[in-house]
């Protein structure tokens, strides 16, 4: 293994300063001082590190986290007094003998250190050139992520599909599909891309298989981590995703260029990049007056920045509004002409079942939302 970097996750313990001094004196590179377990696992997934020096007090450290480290070929060394062999930790350094850390790092790792050497169970990379469908909506657009996951799950029944959570504000795809581990696929892939190391095998390690035809790249664990997705990362992620199959992107709500002189990208860059790479866009809005007002402004804005087809989805359509579909169509086309308009009915019971079970509406089944969205699939994925 060529990587020799060290990750440090000391959880604020006092021994961290001594450890840093020892490593600096030995000229052993510390790639990153990780703030939490999520940060550690995402950094390990980049393939740049060989060792992780951990505090026994690191929140969330368990057998699953240890397996993920070893799968990434990162050997964990715990500083502390607890016996953590039960979760797979075999290398320890007592706090009062922190000077032994270098010796433990230099010690040869046993052959059993990689517990899960098999390739990740995800869709294979092929010579395909899938289409990118970006699901977008203004602030407060109801059910944008639900529409995105449903479109992806419907498409996955017939064609390999990758669902990307690129929302820089409120990523929710992982939780809605029952992926509850703390590893961010987006952060792991972005760091690899930043280092020029994101290729087909490493991108496969960043994704999760949801069902036989659907992979997901989970989003940001917290909205303040958006700065770690640097310029060029999203286009590379989309390029590799196309090689797996069709791509559905759950994007953010704003296309405003919010960069400034202090940084190369703004928070909205993931959404801007996704729209720039899109083959078609699904614009989601609500059927009530506020939702329609926001939708029409977004539609006008999209028409100014991209020539690709924009398919409007009016979500949560219901009779209690007192409006006919033709009334809504006339209102929208007064401002800009979308490619198509699809009306999706309100189905609180079906959505509740989906969210509580951590499954897509396709898996839960029997929702009128599916029937409403199925005709849209042909329009966005097979327009010819």
Task: Give the ranges of each region predicted by the language model.
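Phosphate-binding/switch loop-helix module in NTP-utilizing enzymes
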Residues: 216-263, 271
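Phosphate-binding loop that captures ATP/GTP phosphates
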Residues: 155-216, 341
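Conserved C-terminal guanine-recognition region of P-loop GTPase G domains, centered on the G4
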Residues: 271, 294-306
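Acidic-aromatic/histidine active-site loop/patch
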Residues: 1-132, 181, 187, 191-197, ...
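NTP-binding/hydrolysis catalytic cores, primarily Walker-type P-loop NTPases
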Residues: 356-384
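Beta-strand-loop-alpha "switch" segments that mediate conformational coupling across diverse proteins
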Residues: 316-322, 332-361
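Walker A/P-loop phosphate-binding motif and the immediately C-terminal alpha-helix
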Residues: 127-169, 173-176, 233, 240-241
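Inter-motif core of Ras-like GTPase G domains
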Residues: 242, 259-288
